[in-house]
């Protein structure tokens, strides 16, 4: 039974090797001429320049319009900092939290084992 399985596995392996060796790889795009004089296919060469310029101006206008809409928006994030005294209080609170979380910030200094 094991000889039969071994023969079958060997035959299958031989078949796979023959199938792989007979397959030819597809040529690289730069190697195939494809009727383009050996230069390969370039998608940008077929797009007219006026179309590209039109697309660029349209995208430019869209970006400028989006930036202006963002600058003129009434709904900005200010965390209440522009509301007088309460905004100043909030700013001081946030600065204190940032200082407390900073490694060299206020508070008791921790000594390392080498300083003792």
From Swiss-Prot:
GO terms for cellular component: cytoplasm; extracellular space. GO terms for molecular function: diuretic hormone activity; G protein-coupled receptor binding. Regulation of fluid secretion. Stimulates Malpighian tubules fluid secretion by activating the apical membrane V-ATPase via cyclic AMP of principal cells in the main secretory segment. Residues 1-25 form the signal peptide. InterPro entries: DH2-like. Transmembrane segments: none annotated. The keyword Signal applies. This is Diuretic hormone class 2. It comes from the Eukaryota. Keywords: Amidation, Cleavage on pair of basic residues, Hormone, Secreted, Signal. The keyword Acyltransferase does not apply. Belongs to the diuretic hormone class 2 family. Residues 26-75, 112-116 form a propeptide. GO terms for biological process: adenylate cyclase-activating G protein-coupled receptor signaling pathway; body fluid secretion; courtship behavior; G protein-coupled receptor signaling pathway; negative regulation of feeding behavior; positive regulation of circadian sleep/wake cycle, wakefulness; response to temperature stimulus. It comes from Drosophila melanogaster (Fruit fly).
């Amino acid at each position: 039974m094991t000889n039969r399985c071994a023969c079958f596995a060997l035959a299958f392996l031989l078949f796979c090797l023959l199938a792989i060796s007979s397959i030819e790889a597809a040529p690289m795009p730069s190697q195939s001429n494809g009727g383009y004089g050996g230069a390969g296919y370039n998608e940008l060469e077929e797009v007219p320049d006026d179309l590209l310029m039109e697309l660029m101006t349209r995208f430019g206008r869209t970006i400028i319009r989006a930036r202006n809409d963002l600058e003129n928006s009434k709904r900005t994030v200010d965390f209440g900092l522009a509301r007088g005294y309460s905004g100043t209080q909030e700013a001081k609170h946030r600065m204190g939290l940032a200082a407390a979380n900073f490694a060299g910030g206020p508070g008791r200094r921790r000594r390392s084992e080498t300083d003792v």
